[in-house]
Structure formats: structure tokens, C-alpha cells
Amino acid sequence: MSLFFKPVISPQWSFPVLLKIGVRSYAGGPRTKHKGNSPLASVPTGSSNKNRKQKAKGKKGNKKNDPDQAFNFGEYGGLKKDVEMNMDSTNKLIQKISNFDQLLILPPVRDAVKEIISKESLKLQDSRKKTSENIIPSPIQTVAIKRISKNLMDPKLQIHAIAAETGSGKTMAYLIPLIDYLKRQELETPELWETLRKNVLIRSIILVPTHELVDQVYETVSKTKTLLGLNSFKWDKATSYRDLLENIKNRIDILVTTPGKLLNLFSIRMITRPDKVLSKVGFVVLDEADTLLDRSWLEETHSAIKRIPNINHLIFCSATIPQEFNKTMQRLFPTVVPIMTPRLHKLPFALDFKVINSALSPFKGSKIKALAQTLYAISNDDTEPGFEKRCIIFVNEKKNVPEIVNLLNKKFGHNAIGLTGEDTFEERSEKIMPFLSPPRPLSEVVAQSTSPPTSLKKFEIPDSNIVIGKLKNTNSNGTAPSNKSLHVLVTTDLMARGLNFKGVRNVVLYDVPKTSIDLIHRVGRTARMKQGGRVFMLTDSKTKSWAKALPKIIKKHQRLS
């Protein structure tokens, strides 16, 4: 029985059913044992097999017209059948709330939130019209704030799981209740605040799986210093113990770090009572929780949580709910309350998904030629006028990254860099920065092309839904002499989790993802927050049958299963 599928309190309650999707296999990683019986053990299991068969028979005729029917085409990636989601109450709430003024947030926090979102929006190409006056909450922000704020200052432990599609504003969905919680402590309990204000302590913690995510989340959190007077601090690989100690002495309101770093707090000799430093932490968030609770992370993450004795709010946040994550939540945190949006596990509305079969002419089985021609078409079309173009290429195996980068640069004249887990933290930070930053205007980009602009001759690839451009004065291999105006990053799933590639409009899936989880996260690096974006999936004779249905499911708004 799964926590996200059955009611926790009574049969009359019905939490939204959460679909099960395939999960990746991880080597090793101990499982944490959970003592005691889950309160779910006595929950009724629902209809009998006979009733289920009758219901299935009755619905069979309407299968094609069901908008919530999950995509289950082919067997590649171990896709599993979905179940319907009951989202009536969530939909009504989303339709009812049209601005932040309708949400239970302190006025200073509300103003600060609008300012932060407005500044973030101004960094994007098509969001220049947004100001703090017309900023509205996204669906997941509406639902999360409404439900968490209902009992925000209740001292008992409250556990929530926020789950929504990629690029939907999940960071602010948990950050707004967190900030509101801290400011209400100051305003509503002045005596308590007086004991905390000048003490050596940490008040809240945000845990993420990578140091890149530490930097990204901290960039947003740090804006609360000038707007609300909150002291935030990031603890990553570049942070010295001395810097950490100095900030703890001055009170850290929001600490952003990884579970491993947090556990290191107990091995720093200069801190004699690390347990006391964490004793006032009341709000803890696990961002990218499906990663932090998978088999390779579970022991470390669970150990970090257990070191925080007085948690008031524990928030799990994720864009996908894999089966293994669902089981882990049920075992370790059986009272968790799910908060989800109707578009969970659906690909973005604004996504343009194209499938290219490299087995056909003119590529004749060469995926690298199909990739080079796709990049060339991107660099020469009329999209993103006035801005530098960027593209992220995802591969399944890190060993293939150097070879692809070398071929793109030396044989096909592209401007590509590779990034894998073997790079140092400093190298990764330097390589990824141009993609995490807003797109640069072309006036700021140094011209690197070795050939002048040339007119395009278009042709359509057979058995494909993509039109490729071709230069009249190409090299013998059919590519342009140089395509330096397009900045290309070749990487693995290391960079597919949580990172906000600001304004990146193009993603290429060089390999078909192994699971629907990987597909959602890779595709989610573009078309974020209702921006436009394109995904080009390269297939071959083995994977074309599974991939060809993906463009249709986006148009039909179907859910991946």
C-alpha cells in the first residue's frame, strides 16, 4: 500500500492519487530501518478485484477521451500504467486564488516575495513586462502556501511533500512559508525572539543534493537580507570553517547546504556543542527530495534529519515521485501530507517537442551527424532575436561526453563544452555559469564566427516532424564552417536535477532517457515558468517506436507514467 494512494485519516478523505513511474537503479546504499507500525496498516484497501474489473469495463469505451489517461506507449524505460488523480479540490483552489493578497502571508513578506519574483522574471527574455504589482502565484505556490500556512505556527511536527512539474516555481512554494514562519516568530513571540536574536544558532535549513543547487537556492534566499533582515548562509565546498563559525555566531536564519556538509558539523573541533547549534532549527526543507531519499543518499540524508531534534515543519520538494521514493516516505514519514498540482508528471505546455530519427537519410545511422545538423539549424533559425543562443545536450553515459564534445568542436565547428561528475567543483561552476545566467544580448557577445551569414535552404527529414536548414556554402560534411554563436553544454543527468537554466530555449536528448523520471528532469531544463522551449530527441531503429508518441502526449496534456 502506498502513502500517496490511500487516505491517512479516514476513508472519507481522499488525497490525490500519485502515479507510479519507473525508477533508476542505484548501486549499493544501505536502507534505513523503521521501527513501529505505520498508521496506514489499518486503512481499507478500497474496491475488490471484481469491482475493479467492472469499473475498468465501464470506462473502457471512454479511454480515448480521458484527458488524465497516462502515456504508456511501448516498453522502453520500463514505463508503468498510471491511475487517475483526484484533483478537484486543488483545481478549485487554484482557480479561486488570483494574487498573493489572497494568501495568508505577512504584508512585509508578501511585498518581499513579489520583489524577489519580479527581479527573477526580469532576467528572462520574454518577462520584461512583469513588475511586483502584477506578479501572481503559480499553481504550486498557491496550493502549498494555502495548506502549509493553515497551521503554520502550530508547534507540533508537520510534514508535507510538495510535488509539481519542473519549472513551476517550487522553490518559492516552500521558501514563502519558511520566510513567513521566521518573521512570525519575531513578531508574534517577541520573548522567544529576544532569546534567539543574539544567540549562536541556526533557525532553518534547506538541504539539496549538489553544490550547484546550493549556489542556486542561496542566490534566491540571500535576497531576504536586504528585504526582510534575514541572515542566510550557504555551506558548500568553497566555504571555510572559519566563515561558517563567524556566521553561526551572528545567527543564521536560513542555512543552505547538503546533508553531508550538515553532518560535518559534528566533526568540527571548534564547535563544542553542535547539537545545541541545531536545537532551535524549526523548519527543514529537502529540495530534490526524490534524489536525497534514493538508495545512494538515504542513510546520509536520514542521519542529517535525525540530528535536528526540534523540527516543527519538514518539507519534501520534488518534480517527480518515483516508486522507491514513495515507499521510503511511507516507511520513514507515514504522516506526510502530499501537496500536488494537476500537471505533475506532465511535460510543459509551452514545449515544442521534435523527434529526429538518425537511422534515416541524410544521417544514415550517424547520431553525431544528426546532432551536428540539429545544432546548426538552431544556430541559424530566427528564434531568440537579439540574444545569444544556448543549448544543453544530455547523454546517458558520462564516458561519451568527451568524444561528442571533441567531434562537435573539431569536425563540425561548434562551440561545445563538456561537464561530468569527474570535473572539480570549481571547473563545474565555471563551465555551467554561462547557462545559469540570463541570456546575453548579442551586442555583448564577441563575434566568433569564421564565416559570414548565409541564406538557408530548408528541407524536411523523412519520418520526422523537424525542418532542418542547410547552408549553400557548407563544408564537405554538410555543416557550416563555424557555428560559434551557439553556446553548447554536453552533460549527463548530473545537471538535469533542479538547476534553473535561465532562458535556455533548446535541449537535445542525444540518448533516449532510460526512465520517464529522467525524461521529465531533462526536458524540464527548458520551457520553464511558461516560457517557450524546444526539445530535440535523437532516436535510432531501437528507440523510435517509443519516442514517436511523445509530441502527441504533450498536445493531449497526458501524464507520463
UniProtKB/Swiss-Prot annotation:
This molecule's function is given as: ATP-binding RNA helicase involved in mitochondrial RNA metabolism. Required for maintenance of mitochondrial DNA.
Motif Q motif, residue range(s) on this chain: 117-141
Q: What is this protein called?
A: ATP-dependent RNA helicase MRH4, mitochondrial
Note the superkingdom of the native organism.
Eukaryota
Q: Enumerate the spans annotated as Helicase C-terminal domain.
A: 370-561
Domain-related comment: The Q motif is unique to and characteristic of the DEAD box family of RNA helicases and controls ATP binding and hydrolysis.
Domain Helicase ATP-binding: residue ranges: 151-339
> Could you say what the effect of mutating P438S is?
In strain: DBY947
Segments for region (Disordered): 29-72
The record ties this protein, via Gene3D superfamilies, to: P-loop containing nucleotide triphosphate hydrolases
Catalytic activity annotated for this protein? Answer: ATP + H2O = ADP + phosphate + H(+)
According to the UniProt entry, its GO molecular function terms are: ATP binding; ATP hydrolysis activity; mitochondrial ribosomal large subunit rRNA binding; RNA helicase activity
Q: Where is this motif: DEAD box?
A: 287-290
GO CC annotation: mitochondrial matrix; mitochondrion; nucleolus
Keyword annotations from UniProtKB, A to Z? ATP-binding, Helicase, Hydrolase, Mitochondrion, Nucleotide-binding, RNA-binding, Transit peptide
Q: What else is known?
A: Present with 736 molecules/cell in log phase SD medium.
The entry's stated outcome for P67S is: In strain: DBY947
Q: Where does this protein have compositionally biased stretches of type Basic residues?
A: 50-62
In the record, the note on similarity to other proteins reads: Belongs to the DEAD box helicase family. MRH4 subfamily.
Supply the source organism's classification. Answer: Eukaryota, Fungi, Dikarya, Ascomycota, Saccharomycotina
- Give EC number(s), comma-separated: 3.6.4.13
